[in-house]
């Protein structure tokens, strides 16, 4: 990043923080804060200034406004002395339960596609927290990270004292880590929810798909699994309609059906080449597990700006997620024209418009210029004096 580009981004961030009112996190006096600044080394050598505490939300606001950070964070933990220079001296008082969803850990693709995919993961997670874990949704704070994902903060007091091992159990359940598909079927009872019913639905859809395909194709797919030959594959294929019925009436009886069913299901749920396994993984939530188990984590400050995108870190109510579009709702800047220089061609959407960026110099809206410069896709070439 050229110095002029860094200065341009910091100027835009300064304008934002001059006007923005950032709501402090709850119990602000018990939170540690950390910041990354636009110093001469940024972004090649990033260093965080942490072990910072504030006595009030106004003090936090004034600090951010005067120093204009590139990135702002606060602790998910509560401390008696958050500004103490060592973790041992802070005196840990508990921590919010956090789930981090980051598209970069799930897929590669366009920024727009990644944002759409991770929104689906957020909706899936919220459904699990509400309908399977019984968490009071009024205690959940949902935040768009400003980058490629969402942070789900569970501030229910019952979880605040959980140690890493207890948090691990929760995130393992959410992510489906260590589940036993055969046990899920064996233990199934009418009305049972959670992974038992999720796996039943996954298996039902998988068998329904097999039932629509040519028998030759089904035999080839099943017989490719270890321990499943052509004869067994053909016999299993003939049983699919009956198995679908059982999955909808008495799933626990399926594994008692006969050895063919046990062998094929065993291979489908364990063999690396199984075409069922991706569907099981898709039924899980793709959360970043280490974030949940870390009881001293720093996480992005809602209302701040993310200097790798120029987007706002947006807090929202759970009910607002469905209509939230980060490519519109998280954009902090407007239409004033700036000049950028790009060494490559790019295509993307922002603020409801599609942009095709050619190589070379180009006038673009400020929102587009900040986005491209923050992501390292362009350098600033100038700001038009006549723009308003």
UniProtKB/Swiss-Prot annotation:
SUPFAM superfamilies: Prim-pol domain
Record's function text: Catalytic subunit of DNA primase, an RNA polymerase that catalyzes the synthesis of short RNA molecules used as primers for DNA polymerase during DNA replication. The small subunit contains the primase catalytic core and has DNA synthesis activity on its own. Binding to the large subunit stabilizes and modulates the activity, increasing the rate of DNA synthesis while decreasing the length of the DNA fragments, and conferring RNA synthesis capability. The DNA polymerase activity may enable DNA primase to also catalyze primer extension after primer synthesis. May also play a role in DNA repair.
Organism placement in taxonomy: Archaea, Methanobacteriati, Methanobacteriota, Stenosarchaea group, Methanomicrobia
EC number(s) reported in the record: 2.7.7.-
Cofactor needs: Mg(2+); Mn(2+)
Top-level division of the source organism's lineage: Archaea
GO BP, sorted A to Z: DNA replication, synthesis of primer
Gene assigned in the entry: priS
Keywords, comma-separated and alphabetical: DNA replication, DNA-directed RNA polymerase, Magnesium, Manganese, Metal-binding, Nucleotidyltransferase, Primosome, Transcription, Transferase
GO molecular function: DNA-directed RNA polymerase activity; metal ion binding
One Pfam family in the UniProt entry: DNA_primase_S
Name of the protein described by the UniProt record: DNA primase small subunit PriS
InterPro entries the record matches: DNA_primase_S, DNA_primase_ssu_euk/arc, DNA_primase_ssu_PriS
Major enzyme class: transferase
GO CC aspect terms: DNA-directed RNA polymerase complex; primosome complex
Family note: Belongs to the eukaryotic-type primase small subunit family.
